[in-house]
């Protein structure tokens, strides 16, 4: 994370667990919102926000178990970014979000077919922004789909932007900043904004679970 701004985890889910999450995509009662990306100029594809992550135990367990390590990293970055620290448990963060009017859960599942892609963006959703998020690959690249690489772009003040392509395997997660990361310069730390997106899928189907820890307004 400190060197590149993106880190790939060991496998977090088995193929069976990945399929269990993919299967939820066809259960409309589990979701609060469906976004057809081309209608909003977001790219092409579909994603859905879970109405209550607790209704999908595997998703809720991932959020709760991954959050403490994410909070530890976020709190290491906080003084470097000149930002606040965050509580040690997900429940405390969700309570803070609710007090600020951010009550809509943000975990989502994204589904891309041939030709689908995501434009570069950031997932902010409100005033309270937990600075790290995780995207978990639910299919095997090269076997279930081709193309569809994850693209990250880092804006560097007074320099050209830097692009990175990341290729996680089935069940692996990518940890990356929601907005920016700290970089040590001559006069201390400065913020480098980062955005993320997805290259066009060439064949097959690509599914991803997105875990954003703050809720939305």
Which stretches of residues belong to each language-model region?
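Catalytic core of Fe(II)/2-oxoglutarate
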Residues: 130, 141, 145-217
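Histidine-centered catalytic micro-motifs
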Residues: 118-125
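A structural signal for short, well-ordered beta-strand segments
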Residues: 107-109, 134-136, 209-213
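Short, conserved beta-strand element in jelly-roll/cupin
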Residues: 111-114, 126-144
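A short glycine-rich, His/Asp/Glu-containing loop-to-beta-strand
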Residues: 102-114
């Amino acid at each position: 994370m400190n060197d590149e701004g993106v880190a790939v985890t060991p496998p977090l889910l088995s193929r069976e667990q990945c399929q269990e999450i993919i299967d939820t995509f066809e259960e409309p009662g589990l979701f609060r919102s469906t976004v057809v990306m081309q209608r909003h100029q977001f790219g092409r594809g579909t994603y859905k926000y879970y109405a209550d992550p607790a209704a999908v135990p595997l998703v809720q367990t991932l959020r709760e178990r991954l959050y403490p390590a994410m909070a530890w990293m976020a709190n290491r970055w906080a003084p470097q970014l000149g930002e606040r620290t965050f509580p040690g448990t997900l429940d405390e963060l969700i309570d803070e979000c609710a007090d600020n009017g951010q009550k809509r859960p943000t975990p989502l599942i994204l589904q891309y077919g041939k030709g689908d892609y995501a434009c570069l963006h950031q997932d902010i959703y409100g005033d309270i922004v937990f600075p790290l998020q995780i995207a978990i690959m639910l299919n095997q690249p090269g076997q279930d789909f081709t193309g569809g690489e994850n693209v990250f772009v880092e804006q560097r003040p007074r320099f050209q932007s830097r692009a990175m392509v990341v290729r996680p395997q089935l069940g692996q997660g990518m940890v990356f900043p929601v907005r920016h990361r700290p970089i040590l310069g001559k006069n201390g730390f400065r913020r480098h904004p980062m955005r993320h997106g997805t290259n066009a899928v060439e064949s097959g189907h690509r599914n991803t679970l997105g875990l954003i820890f703050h809720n939305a307004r």
